[in-house]
From Swiss-Prot:
GO cellular component, one term: cytoplasm
Protein name according to UniProt: dTTP/UTP pyrophosphatase
EC nos: 3.6.1.9
Pfam families (UniProt xref): Maf
Feature type site, description Important for substrate specificity: R11, T79, Q163
Family, per entry: Belongs to the Maf family. YhdE subfamily.
Function: Nucleoside triphosphate pyrophosphatase that hydrolyzes dTTP and UTP. May have a dual role in cell division arrest and in preventing the incorporation of modified nucleotides into cellular nucleic acids.
Record NCBIfam families: maf, PRK00078.1
One BP annotation, GO: nucleotide metabolic process
Keyword match Cytoplasm: yes
């Protein structure tokens, strides 16, 4: 049996190690801009997660990666931040990061992660999502600039990483912490067990 994480995120890799060391990383090369942003955020993140899992399946099929394996399970995941129904993905540059963090300052936002686990041999997929509410304290303009200067905002939905220097912005959290980091591990664990994956 092979377990494949379809993500290059070091944070997701570390979280997955909490339940198993027996997996490999084959990052998805799926272009997220191909999926139209939807107001139905739950469906949107699940479609992104499914697309990433299927993209990785295409990669490993073309490389005869799993021809000798009885079972291959591919984990796709995508995380976005939402405030007032608007999706905040990964910032393109420092200005966009500044705009995002200014908008989140002193307010409550939601973090959504979509999960998709693809059984490559049976061509069966299970999808789900998780939502966590996060409340930020008021953050001064100078503090935001200092945070952006450290570079941690890059490649993170909503321009922050809760597990890093931005942890001081967080006043309250309702729901899964690991979901905010990028991989709702409890939900993933249940999906894998339900699909017969022996962890």
């Amino acid at each position: 049996m092979k377990l494949v994480l379809a993500s290059a995120s070091p944070r997701r890799r570390e979280i997955l190690k909490n339940i198993t060391e027996d997996f490999i990383v084959v990052a998805s090369d799926f272009d997220e801009s191909l999926i139209e942003i939807s107001r139905d955020i739950q469906s949107y993140v699940m479609v992104l997660a499914e697309s990433k899992a299927k993209s990785t399946l295409c990669r490993i099929e073309s490389e005869d990666f799993y021809k000798d394996e009885d079972e291959v399970f591919i984990i796709g995941c995508d995380t976005v931040v939402s405030i007032d129904g608007k999706i905040l993905g990964k910032p393109k540059d420092e200005k966009e990061a500044l705009d995002m963090l200014s908008e989140l300052s002193g307010r409550t936002h939601e973090v959504y992660s979509g999960l998709a686990v693809l059984d490559a041999k049976k061509n069966k997929i299970i999808k789900d999502f998780q939502c966590t509410e996060v409340k930020f304290s008021e953050i001064s303009y100078e503090t935001i600039l200092k945070y952006i200067a450290c570079g941690e905002y890059a490649d993170k939905a909503g321009a922050y990483g809760i597990q890093g220097k931005a942890s001081v912005f967080v006043e309250e959290i309702k729901g899964s912490y690991y979901n905010v980091v990028g991989l709702p591990i409890n939900k993933l664990y249940k999906i894998l067990l339900g699909m017969g994956v022996n962890l």
